[in-house]
Amino acid sequence: KGRPYTKGRQLVATAVEEISELLGDRPRQRDLLIEYLHLIQDTYNQISAAHLAALAEEMRIPMAEAYEVATFYAHFDVLKEGDAPLPELTVRVCQSLTCEMMGAEQLLADLADHYGGVVRVVRAPCMGRCDVAPVAEVGHYHVVNATPDAVKSAVDLKHVHPEFPD
């Protein structure tokens, strides 16, 4: 048909370059998609539409497949074209029934009031720590028996990495 452009989402050259550099010499296997989505999320604090399209191209998978996987999981922050970049830090507050009963809704409201838009505060699905509810996740660090002060302390200390047991 001789189209002057390809069908579908047009790739952004800088995004293609960034994703290619980020993946380096890692294999472009379909079963590594989630791992690479985590890599993009951790590097850029979000997954832009341009980066998602570039990843799909790099891995030679349909854009729809990459998008479906990225948007299925609550931990990935997928931005649509034109969306403003997210704040540098996200605090996720567990919304499981147990966390709700232990005050998660009030915790969410208190944190949102305190941080305004400087730190992104969002609801999150169950984090599997019902025995220490309510739970909040600062970056990748879980604050158990979370209170506004405990979460603020983790944010202030930039305690954003997971703790691994000895």
Question: At which residue positions do the language-model features occur?
Answer:
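Feature of Fe-S/electron-transfer and energy-metabolism proteins
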Residues: 1-166
